[in-house]
C-alpha cells in the first residue's frame, strides 16, 4: 500500500484492546475439587477407549437425528443452496429444517439390492449432517462442519426397514480402514433429564477420531444388502485450543483469606471435559500460566463512567470496593491480560486466556466479583474463579461472539431472542446423552422460564444461548448451557482463523484451509506496514526467560494513574521490538520511510522503556503507540490531556529478556523517537 492511501481503521481503544462486553450471568455454586497441577492437561471425548483400541465391529448405544425440533417462524434467512428435504425432527415434534441453515443433499444413485442411506450425521458438540450446516443472514454468515480428528457418534437413517446387521464402513484412498457394527435405534442413548427421544429411526456407532479426517468416506452395508453410496463428510478444522489460566490475586488476597490457588489455577478435570464437549475443537489443552499466580496490590482503572453514568478520570484502586463502577477493575484487568497475551506472542495463536480475579474489599474480606468481561474476538476474558456460567459466556466473547439477542435484532443471529429455537440438538459425550433445544425439567430456570424465554406451540421454553442469558437452562449435573449450532459454527471459524504452531510444517506454522480441508504451511507476514506489529507479533524467540513489564500512563496527569506494575518473570516468548539507541532500529520504524513505515504512524512512538538489570547492563525498548492523533504522529490528539477521555490513557505490556534480575524500570519521554534518541531523556516513571 502506498503511503498516500487511506489509513486502515483504528482499533477500538487507546490501549489497543478490543471492546469488552460486560456481563453478569447467573452462576451456579457447584463445588470444585482440588486441582493443583501447573502442567498442561488435555481432554478428548469420553468413551473413546474401546473404539480406538479396536477398529473391529462392536455394538454401541447411541442416539440419532441430524437436526432439531420445532423450527421457528422468525429469524430465517435465504439459504445458500436450494433447500433439501426437511430432516426428521425428534419424536413428537414437527419436522422442519433449520431456519437460515442448509445441508448438502445425500447421494441418491442407489441401485437394486443396494442399501440406501436417507440421512447421515455426526454428533460431536451438535448433531451435524455430513455436509455441514451453513447460514446466510442479512448481516452475517456462518457454517458448522464436523470437527476433524475428534470422536463422533455417527447417526444413520436407513431406507430399508428389513436391513439385517448393518455395518458402517470407512474408506480412504480406495483402502478400507475398518467397519463398525451399527447399534439399532432401540439402543440410542437418552436425552438429558429423561426428556423426549431425539429420533426413533437412527442407527449409530462411535467413530474414532482417526477416521474423522478429510478424505475418508463412509458407507453402510447389511448382510442382505450391498454397500450404500459413500458419503464424504466436509470437515472443519482439526486444530486444538489451548486455554491459559492467569489467576490474579488482588489487594492482599492469598490462600489464607480467599479461594486457594489449587482451586483457581485451572478448572477441575470434570469441568475441563465439559468445556471440551461445548467447544468445536479437536482437543482442549488447559494450562496454568507459567508464572503461576499474579499478585497485585494496586490496579489502575482507566477513564470510564461511574455507577451514576458520570465520566471519571483514571484512578488507582487498592481494594475492590474502591472502584467507581462494577466493572472498573475487570476492565483494567482485561486490558492488562490482552496486552500481556500479545506481548508473549500468543495474539494470533489458538490460545484463549482467562483470568480469574480473586480480590479483597477494604475490610480485608474476599469480594464476590459478580460478573465478567470478555474482549470480543480478542482471545481473552476475565471473571470469577468458579468456572461456571460467567466463564463460558466470557470466553464466548473471546471467541468473537456478541450477545445473541442483540445480534438477532441486527440480523446477525438466526434464532429469535438469542434462543435455540431452530438450532440442531446438542450432544454430550461425557454423559452420553443428547441435549434438547427445550429447557429440561431439571434446569434451575425451568419453573419460571415462560416469562423470559421463547416458547414453542405447546408453550414449552426454548433454551437461551449462553451468550443471551442461557446460564440456568442446563440440566442438573451440568455447569454450562448449550450453545446454538450457529454460535458453535462461529467459534469453529475463530479457531480455523488462528495461526497454529506446527512442527510438521516447513515454516513452523500452519493455518487451516477450509476449501482444501487441510492445514497449509503458513509464513508469518507483517500486515499494514507494521501498524500493529511485526510478523503479526509472533515470537522471534520462544521458551526463554522473560520479564513482562506493564505500564499505565495518564497524559492528563490523573492522580496515581501513571504506574509501573511489578514485573512478572517466567519462561515465555519474545516478539520483535525495537531499540531506540540503535540507528538501524530507528530507521526500521521511521514514519513513511522505514522498513515498517506505519509502526509509529498510528498514534506515535513517544515513549521508551529502560530496564536496568542487577548487573548494571541496560536494555531499551520503544513502546508502540501513544497519544497522537490517528494517522498524524506529529500532532497530539485533541483529547490527549482530557482526563475524562480514554485518549489520555494508555496501558503498555512488553516482554524483555529475563535471564538477569531487574534492578530498575523507567519510562522515558522520547518524542518521535524515530528521529533520534535524546541524550538525556526525561524520566517520567521509575520503579
Swiss-Prot record:
Residues 1-45, 73-112 are annotated as: Disordered. Binds 1 zinc ion per subunit. GO terms for biological process: proteolysis. It is an enzyme of class 3 (hydrolase). InterPro entries: Dictomallein, Peptidase_M66_dom. Its cofactor is Zn(2+). Residues 233-501 form the Peptidase M66 domain. It comes from the Bacteria. Zn(2+) binds at residues 393, 397, 403. It holds the Pfam family Peptidase_M66. GO terms for molecular function: metal ion binding; metalloendopeptidase activity. The keyword Zinc applies. Keywords: Hydrolase, Metal-binding, Metalloprotease, Protease, Zinc. The active site is at residue 394. Its EC number is 3.4.24.-. Belongs to the dictomallein family. This is Dictomallein. It comes from Burkholderia mallei (strain ATCC 23344). The lineage of its organism: Bacteria, Pseudomonadati, Pseudomonadota, Betaproteobacteria, Burkholderiales.
Amino acid at each position: 500500500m502506498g503511503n498516500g492511501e487511506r489509513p486502515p481503521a483504528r482499533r477500538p481503544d487507546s490501549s489497543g484492546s478490543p471492546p469488552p462486553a460486560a456481563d453478569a450471568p447467573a452462576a451456579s455454586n457447584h463445588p470444585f475439587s482440588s486441582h493443583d497441577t501447573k502442567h498442561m492437561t488435555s481432554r478428548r471425548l469420553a468413551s473413546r477407549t474401546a473404539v480406538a483400541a479396536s477398529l473391529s465391529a462392536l455394538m454401541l448405544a447411541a442416539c440419532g437425528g441430524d437436526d432439531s425440533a420445532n423450527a421457528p417462524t422468525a429469524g430465517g434467512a435465504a439459504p445458500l443452496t436450494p433447500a433439501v428435504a426437511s430432516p426428521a425432527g425428534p419424536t413428537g415434534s414437527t419436522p422442519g429444517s433449520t431456519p437460515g441453515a442448509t445441508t448438502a443433499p445425500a447421494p441418491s444413485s442407489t441401485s437394486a439390492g443396494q442399501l440406501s442411506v436417507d440421512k447421515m450425521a455426526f454428533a460431536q458438540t451438535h448433531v451435524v449432517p455430513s455436509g455441514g450446516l451453513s447460514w446466510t443472514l442479512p448481516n452475517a454468515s456462518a457454517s458448522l462442519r464436523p470437527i476433524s480428528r475428534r470422536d463422533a457418534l455417527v447417526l444413520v437413517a436407513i431406507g430399508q426397514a428389513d436391513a439385517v446387521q448393518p455395518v458402517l464402513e470407512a474408506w480412504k484412498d480406495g483402502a478400507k480402514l475398518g467397519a463398525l457394527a451399527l447399534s439399532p435405534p432401540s439402543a440410542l442413548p437418552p436425552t438429558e433429564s429423561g426428556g423426549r427421544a431425539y429420533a426413533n429411526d437412527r442407527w449409530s456407532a462411535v467413530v474414532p477420531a482417526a477416521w474423522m479426517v478429510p478424505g475418508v468416506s463412509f458407507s453402510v452395508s447389511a448382510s442382505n444388502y450391498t454397500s450404500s453410496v459413500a458419503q464424504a463428510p466436509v470437515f472443519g478444522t482439526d486444530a486444538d485450543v489451548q486455554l491459559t489460566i492467569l489467576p490474579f490475586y488482588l489487594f492482599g488476597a492469598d490462600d489464607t483469606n480467599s479461594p486457594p490457588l489449587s482451586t483457581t489455577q485451572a478448572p477441575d478435570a470434570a469441568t475441563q471435559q465439559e468445556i471440551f464437549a461445548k467447544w468445536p475443537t479437536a482437543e482442549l489443552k488447559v494450562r496454568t500460566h507459567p508464572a503461576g499466580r499474579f499478585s497485585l496490590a494496586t490496579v489502575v482503572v482507566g477513564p470510564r463512567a461511574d455507577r451514576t453514568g458520570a465520566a471519571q478520570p483514571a484512578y488507582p484502586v487498592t481494594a475492590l470496593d474502591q472502584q467507581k463502577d462494577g466493572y472498573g477493575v475487570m476492565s483494567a484487568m482485561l486490558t492488562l491480560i490482552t496486552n500481556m497475551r500479545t506481548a508473549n506472542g500468543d495474539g494470533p495463536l489458538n490460545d484463549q486466556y482467562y483470568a480469574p480475579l480473586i480480590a479483597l474489599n477494604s475490610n480485608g474480606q474476599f469480594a464476590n466479583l459478580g460478573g465478567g468481561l470478555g474482549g470480543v474476538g480478542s482471545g481473552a476474558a476475565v471473571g470469577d474463579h468458579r468456572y461456571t456460567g460467567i466463564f463460558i459466556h466470557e470466553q464466548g466473547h473471546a471467541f468473537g461472539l456478541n450477545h445473541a439477542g442483540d445480534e438477532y435484532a441486527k440480523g446477525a443471529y438466526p434464532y429469535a431472542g438469542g434462543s435455540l429455537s431452530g438450532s440442531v440438538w446438542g450432544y454430550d459425550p461425557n454423559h452420553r446423552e443428547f441435549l434438547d433445544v427445550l429447557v429440561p425439567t431439571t434446569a434451575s430456570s425451568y419453573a419460571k422460564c415462560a416469562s423470559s424465554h421463547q416458547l414453542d406451540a405447546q408453550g414449552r421454553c426454548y433454551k437461551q444461548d449462553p451468550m443471551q442469558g442461557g446460564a440456568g437452562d442446563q440440566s442438573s449435573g451440568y455447569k454450562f448451557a448449550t450453545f446454538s449450532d450457529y454460535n458453535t459454527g462461529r467459534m469453529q471459524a475463530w479457531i480455523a482463523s488462528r495461526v497454529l504452531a506446527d512442527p510438521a510444517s516447513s515454516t513452523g506454522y500452519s493455518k487451516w484451509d477450509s476449501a482444501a480441508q487441510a492445514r497449509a504451511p503458513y509464513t508469518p507476514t507483517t500486515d499494514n506496514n507494521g501498524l500493529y506489529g511485526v510478523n503479526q507479533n509472533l515470537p522471534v524467540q520462544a521458551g526463554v526467560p522473560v520479564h513482562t513489564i506493564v505500564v499505565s500512563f495518564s497524559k492528563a496527569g490523573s492522580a496515581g494513574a501513571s504506574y509501573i506494575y511489578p514485573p512478572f518473570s517466567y519462561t515465555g516468548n519474545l516478539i520483535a521490538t525495537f531499540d531506540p539507541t540503535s540507528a538501524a532500529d530507528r530507521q526500521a520504524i521511521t514514519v513513511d520511510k522505514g522498513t515498517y513505515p506505519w509502526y509509529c504512524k498510528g498514534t506515535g512512538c513517544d515513549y521508551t522503556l529502560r530496564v536496568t538489570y542487577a548487573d548494571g547492563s541496560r536494555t531499551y525498548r520503544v513502546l508502540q503507540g501513544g497519544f497522537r492523533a490517528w494517522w498524524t504522529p506529529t500532532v497530539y490528539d485533541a483529547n490527549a490531556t482530557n482526563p475524562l477521555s480514554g485518549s489520555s490513557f494508555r496501558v503498555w505490556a512488553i516482554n524483555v529478556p529475563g535471564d538477569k534480575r531487574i534492578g530498575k524500570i523507567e519510562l522515558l519521554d522520547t518524542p518521535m523517537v524515530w528521529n533520534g534518541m535524546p541524550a538525556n531523556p526525561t524520566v517520567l516513571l521509575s520503579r
